[in-house]
C-alpha cells in the first residue's frame, strides 16, 4: 500500500513538473508571435497544460501530499534557453520547431515516469497517459507551422 502511495505521488509530481514546463514555456513564447493561427494553437495548448496541472495538484492533495513543481533553477534554465534560441529568430517556424522538440521531450518524460512508477493507481496512470497523448497530438499540430 505504501509503495502504491509513493508511486502515486511520484507519478503525479512528474505530471505537475511536465505540465509546468509546458505551461511556462508557452507563456514565454505566446507574446513572441503575431501569427494568429499559431498563437491560437499555443493558447489552446497552454489551457490544456493548465487543466492537467490542476488535476495533478488536486490528486496529490487528495493523497495527502504537497506538489513541489519545477525548481527555480529548472525554470531559469528553461527561460534562458528560450531567450537564447529566440534572440535572433522569432519566426513561427523557429518557435514551432522549439515547441515540437519540447513536446517530444515531454512525451519521453511521460513514458519514463510511467515505467518508473508501475504501482501507481489507475487514476494517476490515466492522467499521465492523457498528458502523453496530448503532447503527442500537440507535436503533430505544431509540425504544420514548420
Per-range role (PLM):
Residues 1-146:
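Amphipathic alpha-helical hairpins
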